[in-house]
From Swiss-Prot:
Keywords: Ribonucleoprotein, Ribosomal protein, RNA-binding, rRNA-binding. Signal peptide: none annotated. Belongs to the bacterial ribosomal protein bL20 family. GO terms for molecular function: rRNA binding; structural constituent of ribosome. One of its GO terms (cellular component) is ribonucleoprotein complex. Binds directly to 23S ribosomal RNA and is necessary for the in vitro assembly process of the 50S ribosomal subunit. It is not involved in the protein synthesizing functions of that subunit. The gene is rplT. This is Large ribosomal subunit protein bL20. One of its GO terms (biological process) is ribosomal large subunit assembly.
Length: 119
């Protein structure tokens, strides 16, 4: 059986990593050893931050809802409690969109929550 050298496979692997590292600064885009570490780390950041993004957006939505609901005379927690009491099922993304883009509709939702809390 003939001896198998791994030159072709190594070249393919190096090209794959260097292609993934395209656009990185300095040696990170040119030197295989450094590029490999940079690509691995980038993958870890991407994986982590896909989850962090969800937390960040939820926090942003809550901040926006709280700001607008305070302008209407309720705190965020009172608003959410009132919506639960009134059996109004709107997620935070929709509430935040209403708070930013349709203030009249948001005011109507807050009024429903207020009446549910009063009852």
């Amino acid at each position: 059986m003939a001896r198998v050298k791994r030159g072709v496979e190594a070249r393919r692997r190096h090209k794959k990593v260097l292609k993934a590292a395209k656009g990185y600064y300095g040696a990170r885009s040119r030197v295989f050893r450094v590029a490999k570490q940079a690509v691995i780390k980038a993958g870890q950041y991407a994986y982590r931050d896909r989850r962090v993004k969800k937390r960040n957006f939820r926090a942003l939505w809550i901040t926006r809802i709280n700001a607008q609901s305070r302008a209407e005379g309720l705190t965020y927690s009172q608003l959410i409690a009132g919506l639960k009491k009134a059996s109004i099922v709107l997620d935070r993304r929709v509430l935040a969109d209403l708070a930013v883009y349709d203030k009249a509709a948001f005011a109507a939702v807050v009024a429903k929550a207020k009446s549910a809390l009063a009852a």
